[in-house]
Amino acid sequence: MNWPFFRAAVVLFIFLVVLEVNSDFRIQVRDYNTKNGTIKWHSLRRQKREWIKFAAACREGEDNSKRNPIAKIHSDCAANQQVTYRISGVGIDQPPYGIFVINQKTGEINITSIVDREVTPFFIIYCRALNSLGQDLEKPLELRVRVLDINDNPPVFSMSTFVGEIEENSNANTLVMVLNATDADEPNNLNSKIAFKIIRQEPSDSPMFIINRYTGEIRTMNNFLDREQYGQYSLAVRGSDRDGGADGMSAECECNIKILDVNDNIPYMELPTQSISIEENSLNSNLLQIRVIDLDEEFSANWMAVIFFISGNEGNWFEIEMNERTNVGTLKVVKPLDFEAMNNLQLSLGVRNKAEFHQSIMSQYKLTATAISVTVLNVVEGSVFRPGSKTFVVNSNMGQNYKIGEYVAWDLDANRPSTTVRYVMGRNPTDLLAIDSKTAIITLRNKVTMEQYKILGGKYQGTILSIDDALQRTCTGTIVINLENGGWKTERPNVNGSTTSAYGLTSGGVTTNGYTTGGGVGTVTFAVGTNGYGVGTGVYQPLRDNVHFGPAGIGLLIMGFLVLGLVPFLLMCCDCGGAPGGGAAFEPVPECSDGAIHSWAVEGAQADPGVLANSAVPCIPVTNANVIEYVDNSGVYTNEYGAREMQDLGGGERTTGFELTDGVKMSGGPEICQEYPGTLRRNSMRECREGGLNMNFMESYFCQKAYAYADEDEGRPSNDCLLIYDIEGAGSPAGSVGCCSFIGEDLDDSFLDTLGPKFKKLADISLGKDVEPFPDSDPSWPPKSTEPVCPPQGTEPTGGGHPPISPRFGTTTVISENTYPSGPGVQHPTPIPDPLGYGNVTVTESYTSSGTLKPSVHIHDNRHASNVVVTERVVGPISGADLQGMLEMPDLRDGSNVIVTERVIAPSSSLPTTLTIPDPRQSSNVVVTERVIQPTSGIVGNLSMHPELSNTHNVIVTERVVSGSGITGSSSLLGSAGGGSGGGIGLGSLGGGGGLSSSLGGAATIGHLRGSAEHHFSNTLGSASPTTTRSRITKYSTVQYTK
């Protein structure tokens, strides 16, 4: 590099800069004066114009008007024209308004009010110079006015109370929390500089915390914080501005510091040594309570203790369970102690916490042992089997009474075999073993057969009971016999595919038919070889699995999938729900049809349980002809259908693998169906019962029931008597037709009147009435006389010993009559429907073949009805006198009283020509006399009503009084008295001079007879003598009458 040239260039540059800064731009102009001929040179110098005067600062909170003008602006344009000055901005034309004003001519700016720096730290005034036309002569100028700060705001903490926490035993100078405070005065100024100071500490034993003067950080002063001494500290902190000066402003806050617990206390047991005692061979769940003391925070992991064994519990006889709520340990005995083996134990216990110890005391912890002395008390012990289970081996060469070994109980106190016990077999499958009660020698009862081998699955497991009668104690030992290597031969196949064992017992197949072998698998596969004579070699060899999936199986699978593809096509061709007459279709099922199949799956009524109980296939006891018994009387069933469980009452052990059922609660052998002799099924016996019914017995039973019903139906006579039907809906109000009015005559049910007596029973069943049995044609029926015995007057009769029938309300009852003639048949006239419905009606029906009708029948009934008097269907022989004018009807002043006379048939003798009935104006008593039949001779009787029956609502009907010859009877009917005027109605003898009269207190006559020209009056009445005498009292429900 050429340093001389570089230095020369730098010097020249510096010289030009200095020259430019310190020199003025001047222009000299020559002025020639023509008067005196002289020349003057004027020097013109360019100067920067003075446009503003810098504004003075304003102090907040003071009157700054003494400093006016705080600024002055001026434009050079004012030299040659008029200039107007204007200002704008915050404090002028923006809030706060009117703080600054300007003199438009001189440009002086004045302040007019007190300012607040915290509200407006500074003002920006926009100045403009305008000409007379309002145009800017200069570019607008910004004038800044600064507001000086004063210390008028104290420090403010962000929270009134600060909360912090720190662990005990923390190191010195550990940060606890940081306080935050602010000052609204000017930042980075002494007025806003805050200094912090701790002015108070609670508890005030010794200062534990320090605070940073400038940052507000609170730290620990030392490492002596101890939660067990003080769990919380409270500090009062002051913050002062002006760096804590005396002239500064200050504020205070609270600081709460929680001391957290650490595991710095070693737990220890309340008692250093303890002594206890316990009897041998006993267990105790609360042998000793051990309390642990720990000074750490309760219910925390630092406080919860764990007690452990240091020594003395090598046999695991004891356990310790801790209570976390009380920190108390419970010493338990979980394994019996033996006095003969040890009579004293020394336990050494240690304790620690669940949580690890704090590092501050880790080096100080030393394990301290607590001694527990346990004394074992001696007791008189019984005998026990040692060992608890014993195994023997039995082969096919061992025969009956073969001694396979002995299993004796051991006397623990004497340490020798017990001599005071007796032995019995407990659980003994297939009754295989026997034991000597004194010597405990175990022998075989019989030679082990192949059936027993299969039942046991190759392994026998039973129990032996050792009973000490003196001490009343029993112990149990288990016997296990391995039969796998006993040398039993396998089965060989027969010609028909079944297998025959070496002992000649045939079983259907190659399975064990319901009995598991060892692990519970019920199927055993045999490999059967043949010798030169075609007989199996008897080698027991499981077959190897050589089954594989060949082409034929694949073809069958493909064919199955193809058949499934035809299902949619078949469904399309199926005529499901077709139109009527178009082939098979869905049959409509009526609603509310219960059908004849009942819940017990037998058509018709439920059969007698005692009869059907014999139809099930009985289970036969187990004998040697089919299966050897394998359960003794100590076995108890514990399940139903399909479980494989059996319990032993003596030893409390349970053995699985037996297929037992709860069908008959049998103990001593499995259930065997007679249809499967000699076999035992693998599954539950429920399939055997449900699938193996004795069909011959069931067929015979149902045939006998069908024949009995047929014979009973044929033995009943034809029912050809006059039937009375109540037309349903009679007396309905006129407006009750409703929406069914358009049906018209389609619902005419008059054809039911000609159906005959065959449909009476169907009608009774439909109405829910009790169907009366038809009389048998056998003259011996009924077996005894049922002639009614009428009670004396003033009492209420009972019907046939049956309890009284409670009245029902809100229903309509149809009264049907049945009379069985002994002579020629009766012509059936067309019945006339009653214009009135029956309500609150009591009907007394009587049948007799000879003798005189008992005159005294008294009925007390409190039912109510309308004011109706009905004399209805009085029937006598055809030779009666003219009935015209017989009855007279009074003037019905009360419209509610209705008198109806209907179907009166005259007998051979004349009836009285008049029927006098007084005016029943205030009476509501209704008396109906109905169908009194007398073929030849007269009936002398009367129907009287007590005169006290006025204003009552009792309806009494005397119905179907049938007489063969010379019946004289009366029926006296009494109702509850109601008060008012009333009377009685007396019924005289009808037919031979009988008549009907009444004295109810008035006089009125009926001079005409309704329906005298009915066609059935001329019909000849045959003998209507029934075959028996019956009496019935029926109470009917309430029906409204048409008045």
Swiss-Prot record:
Desmoglein repeat repeats: 819-845, 846-875, 876-905, 906-933, 934-962
Keyword Calcium attached: yes
Keyword list, A-Z: Calcium, Cell adhesion, Cell junction, Cell membrane, Cleavage on pair of basic residues, Cytoplasm, Glycoprotein, Membrane, Metal-binding, Nucleus, Repeat, Signal, Transmembrane, Transmembrane helix
Membrane topology annotation: Single-pass type I membrane protein
Domain Cadherin, chain residue ranges per copy: 50-158, 159-270, 271-385, 386-498
GO biological process: cell-cell adhesion; homophilic cell adhesion via plasma membrane adhesion molecules
Major subcellular location class: membrane
Span of the signal peptide: 1-23
Region of interest (Disordered), ranges: 770-807
GO cellular component terms, semicolon-separated: cytoplasm; desmosome; nucleus; plasma membrane
Glycan-bearing residues: 110, 180, 496
Subcellular location: Cell membrane; Cell junction, Desmosome; Cytoplasm; Nucleus
Cytoplasmic side: 573-1043
Parts of the chain on the Extracellular side: 50-551
Propeptide: 24-49
Tissue: Expressed in the epidermis. Expressed in the muzzle epithelium.
Molecular function GO terms recorded: calcium ion binding; gamma-catenin binding
Sequence intervals crossing the membrane: 552-572
Matching Gene3D superfamilies: Cadherins, TCF3-CBD (Catenin binding domain)
UniProt remark on domains: Three calcium ions are usually bound at the interface of each cadherin domain and rigidify the connections, imparting a strong curvature to the full-length ectodomain.
Subunit structure: Binds to JUP/plakoglobin. Interacts with PKP2. Interacts with DSC3; there is evidence to suggest that the interaction promotes cell-cell adhesion of keratinocytes.
Function, as annotated: Component of intercellular desmosome junctions. Involved in the interaction of plaque proteins and intermediate filaments mediating cell-cell adhesion.
Name of this protein: Desmoglein-1
Record lineage: Eukaryota, Metazoa, Chordata, Craniata, Vertebrata
